[in-house]
Amino acid sequence: MIRWTREAARIAAVAVLSIGMVTALTTPTALDAQTLDALSPQVREFVSFENDQVLIRNVTLIDGTGAPAQRGASVLIDGDRISAVAPAGTELPVSPGTRIFDGSGQTLIPGLVMLHEHMFYPSGQARYNTNEQSFPPLYLAGGVTTMRTGGSVDPYSDLSTRRLIEAGRIPGPHMDVTGPYLEGPGGFIRSFPQLATPEQAVAHVNFWMDQGATSFKAYNLITRETLGAGIEAAHARGAKVTGHLCSITYQEAADLGIDNLEHGFFAATDWVQDKEPDQCPRGQDLRYLDLDLDAPEFTDVVDHLIESGVALTSTLTVVERRASGRPAPPYGAQQAMLPELHESVMARVERNAQREDNPATALLHRYMEMEKAFYDRGGFLVVGTDPTGGGDVVPGYANQRAIQLLIEMGLTVEEAVEVSTKNGAIYLGQDDEIGTIEAGKRADLVLINGDVTTDIEQFRRMRIAF
């Protein structure tokens, strides 16, 4: 759980302690083109400035398309739109009163589009608490301007949070909200529905779409028949379905028409020997270490997903926390934790540091290899953080870390930004509005106080989220 006091709010939304971010809502991010007067005092507290026109010049531009970074570029913002993007040496005409930023030594990227986020956090004993006050500003301060919740335990709260953000009452990113999980009987989390029949899945999807949900997520124990009915119902109403699956293999899910699969290949049961249909075989993680990633056993699954148009969500941030030799959460993230959670997290970091035979370390590297193989074969990769696990994946901070892990996995800086921005926008069907820095698109941008092309630690120094 995250503290939400006035002091913690500043740590969350302005991050003054460690990463030096200021959340600036010029023509407010996630608040459309509202004026400052239309915003609540809670939002105005985090607005750095308001101008009709903003020019960022002489900046290193990573535009989200995967193209090489452009040095000395300029970007002009009019209202809530990007009106011009110019290469080095080009002067863009501006109006009197334009706010001008000298971007020397800084990087401009599109606002992050993250697809496995939550408004809840683990509290032990299979219980999850909602954090609708602290999480939205944390995400925005971490550069996330659009997010999809990767499952909901309190959907009415999530839907209300989205409405409050859109109305300018609280700071936060645009939200694509999943309904409650599509889970089968026997699920271990008390707040999840347990859908036993196709009819129940259809009713579930239709009810929550009527309430405003725009996506759905299937979970471990659902059967193929029930999931297939849920997918069909969601598609009939223009919604997509993702899954953290176990009882259903990735190939089976692709055949059912699923749009997305979570956690890379962490949850795949395609390679479990003698797997029973519609049954979840637990404790099989080490099977990944024996896979030959060049053999048909693996490549056939990958190719089937690609041919079926299934996106894969990388969530290496939550996997990393189990491994040894990994950095502790940054200072600001630690400060946002309750004292008892912080104590538990740091004790686990210390234990992991002393383990030389930790299988989670080898698994982390294997998951990276599998995701990179999927990407290299033409798979559509998106990214999220999954702020659950042991409680040390903190929104905002983890989103910055997610980009770094994609680069560690083998992507270039430009490719990692593309996966974290454009690909998410494409998946959500919003790439005509967001995801890349192009004239005419919404000005969802993040200015970073450093050059990420030479030092990826600079992703921690997000200065302004537009």
Task: Give the positions of each predicted feature.
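Bacterial N-terminal signal peptides
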Residues: 12-26
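Divalent metal-dependent hydrolysis catalytic cores, especially in the metallo-beta-lactamase
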Residues: 135-156, 173-180, 210-222, 231, ...
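Metal-associated gating/positioning segment near the N- to mid-region
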Residues: 106-169, 185-188, 193, 199, ...
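Divalent metal-coordination and catalytic microenvironments
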Residues: 59, 75, 80, 105, ...
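Active-site neighborhoods of metal-dependent hydrolases
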Residues: 204-217, 222, 267-409
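Histidine-rich, glycine-flanked metal-binding segment
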Residues: 38-41, 46-52, 61, 67-109
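N-terminal secretory signal peptides that target proteins for export/translocation
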Residues: 1-7
